[in-house]
Amino acid sequence: AFLWAQMEAADEINTRRIALWNRYNSAFEKFESQGKLRRPIVPERCDHNAHMYYILLPNLKKRTGFMDYLKSQGVGSVFHYVPLHSAPAAQKFSRYHGVMDITDQYSERLVRLPLWVGLDSDVDMVIAKVSDTLSYLDNDC
């Protein structure tokens, strides 16, 4: 029943999430032009459902500092994934395990920011805290 109610409101939910995603994307454009982060790339003629918003920071040290400082400011963020090839089960079950430079690099740099349909009233605060955090990192890392 709960999921059915969400399905019935899917268009409204997606519209609101996309609006929040676009707010992030616009707000962080200046930081991308300064080389502080990279924003998501959505190819032309493609749509997305805004299920998450991520940024790529220059390296693991910056990502760790970013997440720690953002948390100290009351905003949670998470890294996205541990690459499957580096998981313990990969040693046992995978056809490949070992070094995958590009995959490892992205997993060390990617940060997911808060994004859910009820974020409307807090999105400006999150943007401000991310901006403050990036400024802090310029001085600290």
List PLM regions with ranges.
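PLP-dependent aminotransferase class I/II
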Residues: 1-141
